[in-house]
């Protein structure tokens, strides 16, 4: 689960990580008071959306007058912001964070994430922070400092000091950096975080270390342990269909293709999409109905797929282990009748009671083509779509 920048900064402030003074708004009635309360003569208006690249998308704007602040706020509030990290539709802007401009001496990058290769929490830091950090990582990876933390151990002050030296900090900045990194590590480990990032982490002309931005991604599966974090969820930033799918324990991701996919198991779902692509088709979605597939869940899956106007056909690929294929077939027939589906469907069943399930589907009056071989099923669905 992602949260907004202002929410991340609130968590930072509670852990004594230094952040700029900012005021959150959702309307423009008191812009003059906001700017005066922040002080200074240049302000930064920052759109609050769950995506990076806001600066490149026009969502972070410097204003040299209160009049411009008001004009920019009116333009952004209620709009949809498109950035390099959103789709073509963009994300709705319902809130803005206004901050006074900082006197920046240097921009750095700092994050913690789970490294799947080393199986460690890894600190990433760089002296080249800012909007082009992705370019730095791809073109000059030597500029990124990596430090792995033993999952059975902890992050020490000595570890932080080691990284501070790598970044060229003096004694005062090292003290501030150590506090910042140790606090980030506490949030990461205590709140079941997947990624926590400050970009940029700035050094001001006053020799202060400030988190100018904040990004946190929490493990959805651990939210039951963190009711305070779960309350920070903003469903306006989520794809509506993906949100509805999650309520039925369906893992659903929308693509741009025209062949709907319904599969049980993430690995099998990816293999199914690969085969469709291999034979010249284009998947419209990733949809994993999970191991405990029920008729209701299958019906909801068909309903989600059918709402996409670009979908021309559907491939169902089920491997019956604990779940019996004949029960799955009954669920498919019930779901098709309930949803009123008329698109051509190819169903591949394999596993427990697969012959019985395929026989049930063959006898039905619906537009269903059955296969026991996945390759043949992929070829068939591509032909039907063309």
Curated annotation (Swiss-Prot):
One of its GO terms (biological process) is succinyl-CoA metabolic process. Mg(2+) binds at residues 199, 213. Transmembrane segments: none annotated. It is an enzyme of class 6 (ligase). Its cofactor is Mg(2+). It comes from Ruthia magnifica subsp. Calyptogena magnifica. One of its GO terms (cellular component) is succinate-CoA ligase complex. The keyword Glycosyltransferase does not apply. InterPro entries: ATP-grasp_succ-CoA_synth-type, ATP_grasp_subdomain_1, Succ-CoA_synthase_bsu_CS, SUCC_ACL_C, Succ_CoA_ligase-like_bsu, Succinyl-CoA_synth-like. This is Succinate--CoA ligase [ADP-forming] subunit beta. Belongs to the succinate/malate CoA ligase beta subunit family. It holds the Pfam family ATP-grasp_2. Substrate binds at residues 264, 321-323. Its EC number is 6.2.1.5. Coiled coil: none annotated. The keyword Metal-binding applies. Heterotetramer of two alpha and two beta subunits. Pathway: Carbohydrate metabolism; tricarboxylic acid cycle; succinate from succinyl-CoA (ligase route): step 1/1. The gene is sucC. ATP binds at residues 46, 53-55, 99, 102, 107. It catalyses: succinate + ATP + CoA = succinyl-CoA + ADP + phosphate; GTP + succinate + CoA = succinyl-CoA + GDP + phosphate.
């Amino acid at each position: 689960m992602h949260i907004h920048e202002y929410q991340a900064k609130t968590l930072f402030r509670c852990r004594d990580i230094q952040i700029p003074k900012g005021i959150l708004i959702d309307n423009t009635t008191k812009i003059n008071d906001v700017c005066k309360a922040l002080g200074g003569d240049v302000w930064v208006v920052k759109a609050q959306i769950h995506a990076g690249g806001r600066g490149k998308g026009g969502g972070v704007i410097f204003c040299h007058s209160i009049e411009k602040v008001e004009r920019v706020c009116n333009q952004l509030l209620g709009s949809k912001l498109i950035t390099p990290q959103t789709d073509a539709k963009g994300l709705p802007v319902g809130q803005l964070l206004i901050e006074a401009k900082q006197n920046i001496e240097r921009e750095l990058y700092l994050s913690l994430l789970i490294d799947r290769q080393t199986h460690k929490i890894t600190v990433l830091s760089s002296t080249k922070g800012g909007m082009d950090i992705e370019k730095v990582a791809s073109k000059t990876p030597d500029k990124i400092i990596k430090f792995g933390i033993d999952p059975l151990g902890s992050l020490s002050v000595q570890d932080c000091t080691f990284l501070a030296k790598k970044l060229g900090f003096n004694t005062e900045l090292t003290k501030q950096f150590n506090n910042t990194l140790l606090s980030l590590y506490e949030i990461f480990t205590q709140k079941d975080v997947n990624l926590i990032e400050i970009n940029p982490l700035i050094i001001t002309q006053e020799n202060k270390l400030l988190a100018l931005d904040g990004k946190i991604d929490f493990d959805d599966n651990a939210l039951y342990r963190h009711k305070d974090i779960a309350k920070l969820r903003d469903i306006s930033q989520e794809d509506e269909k993906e949100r509805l799918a999650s309520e039925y324990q369906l893992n659903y991701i929308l693509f741009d293709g025209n062949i709907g996919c319904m599969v049980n198991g993430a690995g099998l779902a990816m293999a199914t999409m690969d085969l469709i692509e291999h034979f010249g088709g284009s998947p419209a979605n990733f949809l994993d109905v999970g191991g405990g597939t029920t008729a209701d869940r299958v019906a909801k899956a068909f309903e989600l797929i059918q709402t996409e106007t670009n979908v021309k056909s559907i491939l169902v690929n089920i491997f019956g282990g604990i779940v019996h294929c004949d029960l799955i077939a009954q669920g498919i027939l019930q779901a098709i009748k309930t949803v009123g589906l008329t698109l051509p469907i190819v169903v591949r069943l394999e596993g427990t009671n697969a012959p019985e399930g395929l026989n049930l589907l063959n006898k039905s009056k619906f537009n269903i083509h059955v296969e026991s071989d996945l390759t043949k099923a992929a070829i068939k669905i591509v032909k039907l779509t063309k």
